[in-house]
UniProtKB/Swiss-Prot annotation:
It comes from Marinobacter nauticus (strain ATCC 700491 / DSM 11845 / VT8). Its EC number is 3.1.26.4. A divalent metal cation binds at residues 22-23, 114. Endonuclease that specifically degrades the RNA of RNA-DNA hybrids. It holds the Pfam family RNase_HII. HAMAP family: RNase_HII_B. Belongs to the RNase HII family. One of its GO terms (cellular component) is ribonuclease H2 complex. The gene is rnhB. This is Ribonuclease HII. Its main location: cytoplasm. It is an enzyme of class 3 (hydrolase). Manganese or magnesium. Binds 1 divalent metal ion per monomer in the absence of substrate. May bind a second metal ion after substrate binding.
Amino acid sequence: MAAKAFPPFECSYRGSLLAGVDEVGRGPLIGAVVTAAVILDPARPIPGLADSKKLTEKKRLRLYDDILENAAAWSLGRCEASEIDELNIYQATMLAMKRAVEGLSIAPEYVLVDGNRCPKWQWPSEPVIKGDSRVEAISAASILAKVTRDREMEALDVRFPGFGLAQHKGYPTPVHLEALNRLGVTPEHRRSFRPVKMALDAVGVYGGSSAPVQELNYPADLFENID
């Protein structure tokens, strides 16, 4: 069945200080969820922006450099595995998005977020279904977030050989699940995720040691307003 086609997005905000926000890494079993916020410069257009998942790696890397060079402002946000375990992945994603927008060197007047919900924050905003293919600023954010997280997975692959992280980027593929149940759970795995929790019970920790569990406390009003 063909994917549902969405019409071009029409935003009520017509100014130039529009930030697009997207995330990468909600589904993986390991590592941070990474977000990005981008304000594009109308005077320096970036041809070829599209959903990062639909681009070849070569084109994605070229656009990554173009965005860093030509965007009016950009910022990355993140929540680590320990924060994901404390908050849950959905709330952690909201917090990581908030961190990305807070990090922009130019304050946005309006924010568009990929998906169907926005975090609770001070900026006027709205969610955009399939925004990474309908809004250029969100497309740019998706590219920055994906390239950043992919590189982090390649670095973790060096730290923790045998899991195949450079290939599957931490997603629960058969290769990853087999390695998890053979090698054990690393300090970067998300212990609140069921396959990781099961491997921890069955096999234990990778290398026989684990990082200390950090106590984390967050006010509830950081997160999405669902009223």
